[in-house]
C-alpha cells in the first residue's frame, strides 16, 4: 500500500514558517490550529464521552467569523478541524472554503457520514485533506460506533 504524501508546498511553507519564527527569536509558536467549531456529533461511539461530557454546550457552534478569526490569530499554517463532527456545522463549507482561499492547509476530521453532501459544496484542493476516522474493518467499526452501516457509508 502506497503511503499518502503531504504536498510539497506544505513542506516548504512549514519549513519557511519555522525558519522565519526562529530567525525572529521566537522559541514557541503554533504549527497547527486545532479548530473545533462545535461539540455536537451524529454518532454516540462506545468509549467516547463527548456527548455526555459536553451536554451543556452541545447546541453551541462557532460562527464563521469567530472560527476564521481564531485561525488568523493563531497564525499557524495548518488547520485541523475536528469537534464533535464538524460536517454537522451548517456553515462548515464556508469556513473550509475561506481557509482554502487564504491558502491554509486544512485537515478536516470526520466520521464521513455527511461527507457526500459537502463534496458538492467544496471543490478538491491541494490545501484540503479529508481525514475519515474508522475503527477497523466493517464489523469492528460499526460495533465501535454502535450503529450498523456506518463503515459502508463512510467508505
Give, region by region, the residue ranges found by the protein language model:
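Glycine-rich loops and low-complexity Gly/Arg-rich segments
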Residues: 58-60, 105-107, 131-135, 154-155
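Membrane-embedded glycan transfer/ligation machinery
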Residues: 34, 131, 151
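Conserved alpha-helical substructure of the radical SAM core
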Residues: 2-121, 125-126
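Short, hinge-like loop/turn segments at secondary-structure boundaries
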Residues: 124-129, 148-149
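Conserved radical SAM core fold
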Residues: 86-88, 112-117, 132-147
Amino acid at each position: 500500500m502506497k503511503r499518502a504524501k503531504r504536498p510539497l508546498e506544505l513542506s516548504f511553507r512549514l519549513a519557511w514558517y519555522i525558519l522565519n519564527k526562529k530567525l525572529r527569536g521566537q522559541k514557541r509558536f503554533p504549527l497547527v490550529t486545532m479548530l473545533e467549531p462545535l461539540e455536537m456529533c451524529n454518532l454516540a461511539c462506545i468509549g467516547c464521552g463527548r456527548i455526555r461530557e459536553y451536554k451543556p454546550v452541545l447546541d453551541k457552534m462557532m460562527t464563521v467569523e469567530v472560527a476564521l478569526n481564531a485561525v488568523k490569530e493563531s497564525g499557524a499554517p495548518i488547520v485541523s478541524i475536528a469537534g464533535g463532527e464538524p460536517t454537522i456545522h451548517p456553515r462548515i463549507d464556508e469556513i473550509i472554503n475561506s481557509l482554502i482561499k487564504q491558502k491554509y492547509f486544512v485537515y478536516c476530521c470526520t466520521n464521513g457520514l455527511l461527507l457526500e453532501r459537502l463534496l458538492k459544496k467544496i471543490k478538491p484542493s491541494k490545501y484540503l485533506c479529508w481525514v475519515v476516522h474508522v475503527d477497523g474493518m466493517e464489523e469492528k467499526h460499526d460495533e465501535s460506533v454502535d450503529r450498523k452501516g456506518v463503515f459502508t457509508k463512510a467508505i
